[in-house]
């Protein structure tokens, strides 16, 4: 019967508990977008973050390294087919701890972020009519305002079965158009955030109207949409533990770097997923004056001219 020291029994118990709980994982992701001027596609995008966790059964399926494919791949490393393979603790005889082998880790990294689309179009936001009810010219001044919502939303594309406990933080700043917003969400969650802003607060006007005249003040703005594509890539690190039914070069237990096993077995080396962030915003508010002039009187129809009959 195998005997273990109290130290090894304690560590073995820790690995057993670990296997029953959620995998160890750490690391969050941050995306920062800062535009330098009103040309929004001339923006600096900073993205960073990494999340690492012991590989789960679901992630093994995503990478195609379940027992069958893994045994086949390991058999190509030295020529003998193993009876058992492992990628994490627990294992018989606590192989990873005793031999100081590395459990296979899923490493998820933010590796790419870019602007993929900007759309802008003019939009009439609000109107207001002013009248001069006096019988002499008069100056009319005013300010037309309207509250609107800037929005930021995210959607996940090609989402895979990664067991991630992390947050994704996104901050967007465009000082030239007065835009500053963001969000912090759990990995994989989709949502929409909005902030209310007031247009027209600095776009007052003054105009002279003739007696009985009127005008319409039109508050317009540019309604824009910016799309940002963020790429995340999952790779594997660590060692695959192998048990040969008969000794191989004098040993039953071996370990192979998981990257080597993936190479010789032609297995997936990485898995990608993407997050699409869409920012909706208003900018360049301005007021124009339309229909400036005296109110026209309605024309009255003259009665038909009577013709004298002989």
From Swiss-Prot:
Contains 3 disulfide bonds. Gene3D superfamilies: Proaerolysin, chain A, domain 3. Residues 1-27 form the signal peptide. Keywords: Disulfide bond, Membrane, Secreted, Signal, Target cell membrane, Target membrane, Toxin. GO terms for cellular component: extracellular region; membrane; other organism cell membrane. Expressed by the venom apparatus. Its main location: secreted. One of its GO terms (molecular function) is toxin activity. It is found in: Secreted; Target cell membrane. Belongs to the megalysin family. May function as a large pore-forming protein. This is U-megalopygitoxin(8)-Mo15.
């Amino acid at each position: 019967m195998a005997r273990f020291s109290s130290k090894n029994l304690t560590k073995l118990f820790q690995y057993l508990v670990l296997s029953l709980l959620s995998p160890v994982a750490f690391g969050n992701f941050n995306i920062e977008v800062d535009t330098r001027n009103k040309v929004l596609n001339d923006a600096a995008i900073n993205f960073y973050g990494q999340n690492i966790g012991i590989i789960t059964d679901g992630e093994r399926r995503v990478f195609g390294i379940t027992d069958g494919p893994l045994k086949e791949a390991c058999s190509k490393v030295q020529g003998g087919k193993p009876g058992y393979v492992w990628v994490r603790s627990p294992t018989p005889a606590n192989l990873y701890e005793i031999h100081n082998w590395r459990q296979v880790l899923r490493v998820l990294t933010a590796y790419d972020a870019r602007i993929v689309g900007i759309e802008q179009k003019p939009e009439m936001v609000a109107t207001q009519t002013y009248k001069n009810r006096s019988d002499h010219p008069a100056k009319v001044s005013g300010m037309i305002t309207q509250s609107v919502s800037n929005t930021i939303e995210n959607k996940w594309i090609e989402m895979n079965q990664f067991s991630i406990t992390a947050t994704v933080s996104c901050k967007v700043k465009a000082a030239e158009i007065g835009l500053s917003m963001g969000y912090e969400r759990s990995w994989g969650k989709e949502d929409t955030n909005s902030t209310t802003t007031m247009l027209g607060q600095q776009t007052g006007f003054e105009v002279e109207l003739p007696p009985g005249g009127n005008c319409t003040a039109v508050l317009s703005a540019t309604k824009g949409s910016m799309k940002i594509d963020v790429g995340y890539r999952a790779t594997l690190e660590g060692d695959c533990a192998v048990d040969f039914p008969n000794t191989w070069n004098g040993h039953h237990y071996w370990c192979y770097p998981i990257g080597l096993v993936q190479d010789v077995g032609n297995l997936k080396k990485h898995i990608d997923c993407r997050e699409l962030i869409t920012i909706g915003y208003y900018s360049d508010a301005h007021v124009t004056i339309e229909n400036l002039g005296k109110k026209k009187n309605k024309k009255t129809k003259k009665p038909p001219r009577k013709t004298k009959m002989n």
